[in-house]
Amino acid sequence: MQLTFVRPATTDGRSAGPVGCPAGPGGVTDLLSGLSRTEPPERPEGVCIRRISQDRESIERIGRLYFRSYPDGEAGICEEAVADVEATSAGDYGTWVPEACLVAEEGGEPVGAILVTDNPPWDDVEGLIFIIDLFVAPGKRGRGIGGALVGAALAAVGDREVGLRVESENAAARRIYERHGFAAR
């Protein structure tokens, strides 16, 4: 089951509650929403976080990371994963938010990414900033990379309301989002 999380916008710049990401095929979601933080996020040592370039080579690298980051078959085949990242970049899931679409790199290699859009096409999150996906390479999890990406993306969007969806059984992702002030909707 998918959970949708929303973090409502507030004027004091502090977080209000947990969040989530889109689930795979057949999943159900609850909405989580939250307010972005204004303080810079902590970053794991040796990890660089920067904007994702929308050139073909960069999008393909992020698509391959997306494919590797999920269990076999969950992201389809590699070409489908790349096509999904391309579709996000092209605006199929809302307007790409360049300052919040970020990649974490270690030694020049991508180890995690967050894809964020504005005004996604789904009725329950219309008008929100929306975290389309957050993914970290399997061997790099548990080091704070996902949390650093979420924190950096939230800082980039200011005090806008942010939503996302996450699989209910994905406890690690839920903890990341809840630490950043998101709550189930």
Predicted feature descriptions by range:
Residues 16-18, 177, 182:
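Conserved active-site tyrosine of GNAT-family acetyltransferases
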Residues 119-131, 141, 160:
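A conserved beta-turn-beta hairpin within the catalytic core of GNAT-like acetyltransferases
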Residues 133-136, 142-156, 174-179:
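Conserved acetyl-CoA-binding loop-helix of GNAT-fold acetyltransferases
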Residues 101-103, 109-118, 130, 135:
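Conserved beta-strand in the GNAT
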Residues 6-14, 138-141, 163-174:
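Conserved beta-strand-loop-alpha-helix junction that forms the acyl-donor binding cleft
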Residues 1-53:
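Acyl-donor-binding surface of acyltransferase catalytic domains
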Residues 48-67, 71, 75:
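A short beta-loop-alpha structural element at the N-terminal edge
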Residues 70-90:
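Conserved GNAT-fold acetyl-CoA-binding loop/helix
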